Structure formats: structure tokens, C-alpha cells
Amino acid sequence: MAAVDIRDNLLGISWVDSSWIPILNSGSVLDYFSERSNPFYDRTCNNEVVKMQRLTLEHLNQMVGIEYILLHAQEPILFIIRKQQRQSPAQVIPLADYYIIAGVIYQAPDLGSVINSRVLTAVHGIQSAFDEAMSYCRYHPSKGYWWHFKDHEEQEKVKPKAKRKEEPSSIFQRQRVDALLIDLRQKFPPRFVQQKSGEKPVPVDQAKKEAEPLPETVKSEEKESTKNIQQTVSTKGPPEKRMRLQ
């Protein structure tokens, strides 16, 4: 496909030169508009001839052809420039209007472009409505036409929900998590006890658990001690009886 020339669709572009904005006024706006990089400016116009011959803009009235004039000015924000075809000192045909807002140049749409855009927007909306209505329309030779909306609702329910992709964490989030972990480590530092030389340090809680005897072992030791006492008592025998003195 051939590349589309930018001049074929001037309604969709704008142009600005920031160096001119501070000095833009009614006297310099036409010079600003005649910049070489401005796509809206026609090099074959009478303004270019007057500029090369260093004449005043009043000489445009005595010439025939395309020219640019300042139609309206509302300094320093708004300027309107008209492109027109001059046929005689008293007869001109407007060709296009351009408006400058805050230094940015736009081409004003003509009536045909406005009507075309509005009609296309309206037709697109009507066509979308008809397409949506036809998707619910059903026909059978014995029943005729009817509307059926349940299939569409069931299809929406059956459609699996797209899984949300896990977004990678940002640098700020990673730094924030590291700062919180360091803060927790400072508030609750781990404690270690060196049990034997050459071994790895063991946490204090674990060392306490190893040092404390289990309750079952304590009970078994108590039972063994009671048994030993009973055995010693049984081996000694009953105590001897002594005679009472009358």
C-alpha cells in the first residue's frame, strides 16, 4: 500500500513552534504561520511573493491567487487565519480556516467534514444496535420469529474468567519489605547458646527444652524410688516385741 500523504488529512494533525509563543501577537502571527515546517502553509501563495519582495500586506488586494489573512485576533490566546482565493480586489472565495490556540495551529473542519463525521457516528451506533438485536432473534418454520435471551446469559456464565496475571514487585516494594524484616529482627533478635566447643549454636528455647526432663521420665523415676523403699522394708522383717514391765 502506498503511504498516505500528510497533506491529505490535515484535520487530524496540529503544528506548533514553541520559540514563537512568547512573541506571538497580531503583527507576527502571519510570519509564524508562514514557517517552512508548517504543513498548513502553501508556498505558492501571494504572501510568499510579498514577503520576498519586502512589500506590505496591502499589496495582496492588487494580486490574484491564494492568500492568507488574519481574520480574527484575541490576544494572546486565539488567532484565526483564513486561506482564500482572490479573484479581484473586491471578490474572494474562502477555502479554509485555521485557528491558533496557545501557539498550536489546527485546521477548522469544513461543514461537509462535520456532517460526514456525525452521520458516520450515528450510522455506526444504529448498526451496532441492529447487530445486537439480531443476536437474540430466533426463527422456526412452525413458531415464526421470537426473542431468546437465555443462551447469551448462559454463554457468559460458561466463559472462564481470565486469570489475573501476577505483576512483578517493584523496587520500592522490595526495599520496603527488606526494611520491615530488618526492623522485626532488631526488635526480636534470635538468641543462641554455645553448648560444646566445636558445635553449632543452638537457640535458647531449644536448649531449655533439652535441659528440662520429660514428665513421663520424672514419674517413672518416682515409681522406681517407691519400689526400692518397699523392698528394703520387707527384707528387714517385723520389729521384735519387748516385754512390758509391771
UniProtKB/Swiss-Prot annotation:
It is found in: Nucleus. Residues 206-226 have a biased composition (Basic and acidic residues). Residues 191-246 are annotated as: Disordered. Its main location: nucleus. The modification N6-acetyllysine is found at K236, K241. The keyword Transcription regulation applies. Keywords: Acetylation, Activator, Isopeptide bond, Nucleus, Transcription, Transcription regulation, Ubl conjugation. Pfam families: Med6. There is a cross-link at K208 (Glycyl lysine isopeptide (Lys-Gly) (interchain with G-Cter in SUMO2)). The keyword Transcription regulation applies. One of its GO terms (molecular function) is DNA binding. GO terms for biological process: positive regulation of transcription by RNA polymerase II; positive regulation of transcription elongation by RNA polymerase II; positive regulation of transcription initiation by RNA polymerase II; protein ubiquitination; RNA polymerase II preinitiation complex assembly; somatic stem cell population maintenance. GO terms for cellular component: core mediator complex; mediator complex; nucleoplasm; nucleus; ubiquitin ligase complex. Belongs to the Mediator complex subunit 6 family. Component of the Mediator complex, which is composed of MED1, MED4, MED6, MED7, MED8, MED9, MED10, MED11, MED12, MED13, MED13L, MED14, MED15, MED16, MED17, MED18, MED19, MED20, MED21, MED22, MED23, MED24, MED25, MED26, MED27, MED29, MED30, MED31, CCNC, CDK8 and CDC2L6/CDK11. The MED12, MED13, CCNC and CDK8 subunits form a distinct module termed the CDK8 module. Mediator containing the CDK8 module is less active than Mediator lacking this module in supporting transcriptional activation. Component of the Mediator complex, a coactivator involved in the regulated transcription of nearly all RNA polymerase II-dependent genes. Mediator functions as a bridge to convey information from gene-specific regulatory proteins to the basal RNA polymerase II transcription machinery. Mediator is recruited to promoters by direct interactions with regulatory proteins and serves as a scaffold for the assembly of a functional preinitiation complex with RNA polymerase II and the general transcription factors. This is Mediator of RNA polymerase II transcription subunit 6. It comes from Mus musculus (Mouse).
